[in-house]
Amino acid sequence: MLSIVSPTFMVSCGNHGAGDPSTIPFVRDILSDTTSTVYEKIRKSCIDGRDGSIAIVGPSEQTLFLADNFMTCDDFDNVNGRCIPDGLPDFAGETFDLICDSANAPYEGYLKQGNDVFLKELTVKNFLSSIDTVFHASQFDKNTTERKSASKIVILSSSYLSAFGYHDIMSIVNAARPDIAVISPVHSMFRYAIQHHPEANGSFAVWTDEQTLGSGIYATAWSEMVKEYKTLKYEAYCPQHGKSLRDRIISFFRMYKSIGNTHKIGAVLVDDMPLKADVLNEELARMRENNDDSLTFYSGLLTDRFEFIDPATAIASECISFMRKENCFTHRVAYPSTRIYCTVPVTGMAAQDYSPQGGFTEDFKYNRADCSDFETFMLVEKPTRFLDENLKQFLRKNAQNIYNEYVSD
């Protein structure tokens, strides 16, 4: 490994024994020295929140998909904040800094290798990059940096980060800078459901895929949230892919009923990108209007105000609520804008650590040691090769606004 320490991440890891013992060593060491450069950056970051950006951090697909939703989101009245569309983008005038973690994703590999501590650490490091005001000018120039905005809100785009990093970030934020908003998709969906569906008495269902469910993400988030919301409980199911929306909805309700559930569901949290809650809600409304026989069999399981909720819906609501509370809207008369940054491998490491495509080999990526003085990735502005064909196809199909801005001629 090459000996490189980014100024953003410069922490000397030792056994100081400070802070929350449930956090990772990297975080405990940040909290143990309140005079350190890193701690000071956190404490002083984005003092004037109005000028700050909204960062979205995580794997490229999830990050760009969320950003695309926020570009045209119109769920609120921009004057009084009521949940009524007003024909104006909810995030008018705001800038989204998209930190696509190309170097380190996908994240499930860390869990397969039993290296969840490193996943938590890189989540914290990406958070630090989002609130910092510098990024590297080039992957091939480790010394030259350029300026960017610090972020007033940091959104984690992947559910994996809800379980592997969010708690550690919040340990830092609560100690050093409580007025920075950090939003986790899983925590945000649960909060939204609790706030908007009190009739459910904290009982909800989760629609996700087998890999996400098997990772323990929801069990981890629930164990944290139940301390605050004592009645919170959930059941998770994985409807089959490849069927029509109607069939998938019926499949979900069938799974819920098949284990003997009789209590009504107030909301279903949908964590199965690129599936959107509004599409499911529209299909469910059509089924009701058409008196669908299959739905009639399960309608007794749904409260009168039942709805599907996805990360984009819940996160947008939490962002708007925070900005109204802190009075940190930019008040610029403009459409929302985006800037894309990416994590990339540093140069100069052993040749066998790089894949033919220029990233890390899987063996190297998923077996890196936590709390090391050797930094292996850096943040740069969107490089030329960032959008490969697979990502372009994903954007063309699922994130048309981002596609038009960065891909379409």
For each of these PLM feature ranges, what is it?
Residues C13-D409:
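Non-catalytic structural scaffold of enzyme domains
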Residues M1-T8:
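Bacterial N-terminal signal peptides
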